[in-house]
Amino acid sequence: MPKYRSATTTHGRNMAGARALWRATGMTDADFGKPIIAVVNSFTQFVPGHVHLRDLGKLVAEQIEAAGGVAKEFNTIAVDDGIAMGHGGMLYSLPSRELIADSVEYMVNAHCADAMVCISNCDKITPGMLMASLRLNIPVIFVSGGPMEAGKTKLSDQIIKLDLVDAMIQGADPKVSDSQSAQVERSACPTCGSCSGMFTANSMNCLTEALGLSQPGNGSLLATHADRKQLFLNAGKRIVELTKRYYEQDDESALPRNIASKAAFENAMTLDIAMGGSTNTVLHLLAAAQEAEIDFTMSDIDKLSRKVPQLCKVAPSTQKYHMEDVHRAGGVIGILGELDRAGLLNRDVKNVLGLTLPQTLEQYDIVVTQDDAVKNMFRAGPAGIRTTQAFSQDCRWDTLDDDRSNGCIRSLEHAYSKDGGLAVLYGNFAENGCIVKTAGVDDSILKFTGPAKVYESQDDAVEAILGGKVVAGDVVVIRYEGPKGGPGMQEMLYPTSFLKSMGLGKACALITDGRFSGGTSGLSIGHVSPEAASGGSIGLIEDGDLIAIDIPNRGIQLQVSDAELAARREAQEARGDKAWTPKKRERQVSFALRAYASLATSADKGAVRDKSKLGG
């Protein structure tokens, strides 16, 4: 029988000092036999996805206390990728994932907490907390802040839905008037919550459902809707049950590594491919799997991508649907239901509610459930009122979207595409693979060949695109922007958005060892591995080289002979200390970022730290 971790600090005369300090936080004699549960919050006023979380930790804590536990809240940092985008701030985004994971480990282990409720939401916060949860392997439940309502505005006498990416594209389009650009900017992000499309934050919060670590509805129920409050109340109650099951009944099925098993990781990636999730999820699932000591690699993702169809299409891949529409169609469980009926899921998995996948689908899939309360929850919709307050409205759709032929979520027979929304490509400068969000690629450019235009920083590429130096047919190559080379593996949302604003969204390709925002669409290929800074062949590409992209056959090829590439590699190595570095780039890199770069691995490893360099 495992002993409560917290007993280390609450039992025995030699812990009198620790108990004295616990008393100063409000604990009493009656609390010293109870489980201590960390409420891991991520409230900040910097990020719309987190601005409403201030009081939600208290909400969870009250339920923990009522259920017989002791709740202790602490906060992590949270970087807003959209605000950090397009300048030096983006260098810090991916490294913040490791800091978040480490900070959770530090707090939980330093104070011997028994379990956690993780209140996350945006791009690196959910992955960081997920990595920490699987590293620590103590009972955990995730409950995120929820998606933002889609923006709406009237253009050309038509009401259209908007999000952050629309504001960026309009702002950079010289053909758009100042007044229209300002109108879109003011309408794009109307409420608190994670940006309204299937971007990285919402993708990851959906994946926690498929991993079994959060409750049904977590990924899609709007931040502003009153129904979302119940997820927080349930999390507080349920975590005490899970904790007691493990520590008092020796039930290891309550632990995250036994819930988020390899089978669950395969289900999560299957969901990701089917819903056309952000390419960043590949990085984060690979990183989380390593923390869980699960053998889940790019090879597994490649195999899944070849057999899983695209059953859901959401912004940025279409303007028609946003997360509020996914929820109305049954949310994550709705997609999982269709995947299960297609025979594409591992069924022998459980979630934090203790339900198997078939039990979860029976109760929560709107196509089959007889539970009116569940159907009512999935009718939760937007209010269209600007707010930063959680649970501030209770509007409902008149009907559910259960049309699996033409609705937001489709059945296998009516899939948007027989190929899934993500694909792994391999070739002579991506020997370890690269990732493309096929959900956002127009059919006309699934096969594309063009001359390379090579840039050694995102800034240079942006300048060239806006300066008209990139033309239809070009393949833009941005290198030395990987985890080590950036450092920090910047997102390339500005270059892809500016290609669209210049009318080149369906006429050019962009390839990088960096990564893309979940808001990216178009022929955007990232995570090229190995990265240039690690000696990857992307560092050997020269202006004018022809690059052939073949998504249907999962290929990407630099049309240069092996002999020529060998000669270029020899010349690169001859640069000595300057080898595999940009020839010219002005960039201030802090000590903190250099420390991150010194341990960073390429994207095919999840951009995690190289433990071998530390002897572990």
Curated annotation (Swiss-Prot):
Pathway: Amino-acid biosynthesis; L-isoleucine biosynthesis; L-isoleucine from 2-oxobutanoate: step 3/4; Amino-acid biosynthesis; L-valine biosynthesis; L-valine from pyruvate: step 3/4. Binds 1 [2Fe-2S] cluster per subunit. This cluster acts as a Lewis acid cofactor. GO terms for cellular component: cytosol. Its cofactor is [2Fe-2S] cluster; Mg(2+). PROSITE patterns: ILVD_EDD_1, ILVD_EDD_2. One of its GO terms (molecular function) is magnesium ion binding. InterPro entries: Dihydro-acid_dehy_C, DihydroxyA_deHydtase, DiOHA_6PGluconate_deHydtase_CS, ILV_EDD_C, ILV_EDD_N, IlvD/EDD_N. Mg(2+) binds at D81, D123, K124, E491. [2Fe-2S] cluster binds at C122, C195. The active site is at S517 (proton acceptor). Keywords: 2Fe-2S, Amino-acid biosynthesis, Branched-chain amino acid biosynthesis, Iron, Iron-sulfur, Lyase, Magnesium, Metal-binding. The modification N6-carboxylysine is found at K124. HAMAP family: IlvD. Functions in the biosynthesis of branched-chain amino acids. Catalyzes the dehydration of (2R,3R)-2,3-dihydroxy-3-methylpentanoate (2,3-dihydroxy-3-methylvalerate) into 2-oxo-3-methylpentanoate (2-oxo-3-methylvalerate) and of (2R)-2,3-dihydroxy-3-methylbutanoate (2,3-dihydroxyisovalerate) into 2-oxo-3-methylbutanoate (2-oxoisovalerate), the penultimate precursor to L-isoleucine and L-valine, respectively. Belongs to the IlvD/Edd family. This is Dihydroxy-acid dehydratase. The lineage of its organism: Bacteria, Pseudomonadati, Pseudomonadota, Gammaproteobacteria, Enterobacterales.
